[in-house]
Amino acid sequence: MTKQTIRVELTSTKKPKPDPNQLSFGRVFTDHMFVMDYAADKGWYDPRIIPYQPLSMDPAAMVYHYGQTVFEGLKAYVSEDDHVLLFRPEKNMERLNQSNDRLCIPQIDEEQVLEGLKQLVAIDKDWIPNAEGTSLYIRPFIIATEPFLGVAASHTYKLLIILSPVGSYYKEGIKPVKIAVESEFVRAVKGGTGNAKTAGNYASSLKAQQVAEEKGFSQVLWLDGIEKKYIEEVGSMNIFFKINGEIVTPMLNGSILEGITRNSVIALLKHWGLQVSERKIAIDEVIQAHKDGILEEAFGTGTAAVISPVGELIWQDETLSINNGETGEIAKKLYDTITGIQKGAVADEFGWTTEVAALTESK
């Protein structure tokens, strides 16, 4: 595809920036956003960076009615020597197109969109917080915009990228969380949209999450939608268990999202010479491992939290305290290594980080 010039319109009124030590997750947004449109007769066109602003859309826009939308999530960091770094952004672009395919959304030019993302981050670089546990969250997403109430794929779309300075996703930070195994609701089934990053997957998880939070849990552990026996994900993260020295994560089966942090964790564990298995793992196996005293660690992995240790797991009437409710050695090492690579403090032996070039002109 021919690369299109990205036009830039800078804001005339900059917003006040939040205290980096008081950041929550996803409540504050930067001065600018990236936008690109699609029409069936034109393809993707008019890539632009403009001041952050509301959208004006027809009430019949198909995204409102049939949920034809996909999104991604990644982060930008400032290194100690003031370089802006992204973590494996090309994988997010690749996965966005995989989600597009599942949702009948036209493929994007991954290099074009990544270039727009980099330029946007460079323009709003001053919004990247540098306090411990903070980052600039990047949310690319695509919505169906055609005003039509028929059930079909839209002929027009809008791609946007917005930025948000964030603190830790969970108030616990790297401290272990309590999770409940979900036995009533299911997240996804094979052949559905579980392996796509689309809004409906998250909307359908809210009820189970609400019930869990009312009982004092941070997240739910999802089981498969057929037998309600095999472990799939934890909340919006992939899940790992360390059982008798073996680190196990559910194999990708069409209903589990292929996490970029998950892939990075597997690569690191193998690099460290540890035994890693991607396979089916039943909740009964985890319960039995706990009874046998060989359930050593459990942790979730994802862009938002990076690594989230599980300190307590509740299944029916059983409460499993994992590693005495403390962060495990592997989880801590993974967290320190990945966040270190992301911020340029740990050598990047895998070539995972991408530097965002500084603007040649002052904003």
From Swiss-Prot:
Gene3D superfamilies to which the protein is assigned, alphabetical: 3.30.470.10, D-amino Acid Aminotransferase, subunit A, domain 2
Pathways involved: Amino-acid biosynthesis; L-isoleucine biosynthesis; L-isoleucine from 2-oxobutanoate: step 4/4; Amino-acid biosynthesis; L-leucine biosynthesis; L-leucine from 3-methyl-2-oxobutanoate: step 4/4; Amino-acid biosynthesis; L-valine biosynthesis; L-valine from pyruvate: step 4/4
Modified residues (N6-(pyridoxal phosphate)lysine): 197
EC number, as in UniProt: 2.6.1.42
Enzyme class: transferase
Molecular function via GO: L-isoleucine-2-oxoglutarate transaminase activity; L-leucine-2-oxoglutarate transaminase activity; L-valine-2-oxoglutarate transaminase activity
Reported cofactor(s): pyridoxal 5'-phosphate
Top-level division of the source organism's lineage: Bacteria
Transmembrane segments: none
Annotated GO biological process: isoleucine biosynthetic process; L-leucine biosynthetic process; L-valine biosynthetic process
Regulation of this protein's activity per its record: Inhibited by canaline.
Catalytic activity: L-leucine + 2-oxoglutarate = 4-methyl-2-oxopentanoate + L-glutamate; L-isoleucine + 2-oxoglutarate = (S)-3-methyl-2-oxopentanoate + L-glutamate; L-valine + 2-oxoglutarate = 3-methyl-2-oxobutanoate + L-glutamate
Keyword Amino-acid biosynthesis: yes
Entries under SUPFAM superfamilies matching the protein: D-aminoacid aminotransferase-like PLP-dependent enzymes (SSF56752)
Keywords from the UniProt entry: Amino-acid biosynthesis, Aminotransferase, Branched-chain amino acid biosynthesis, Pyridoxal phosphate, Transferase
Role according to the record: Transaminates branched-chain amino acids and ketoglutarate.
Family: Belongs to the class-IV pyridoxal-phosphate-dependent aminotransferase family.
Name recorded for this polypeptide: Branched-chain-amino-acid aminotransferase 2
Protein species of origin: Bacillus subtilis (strain 168)
Upper lineage: Bacteria, Bacillati, Bacillota, Bacilli, Bacillales
Gene: ilvK
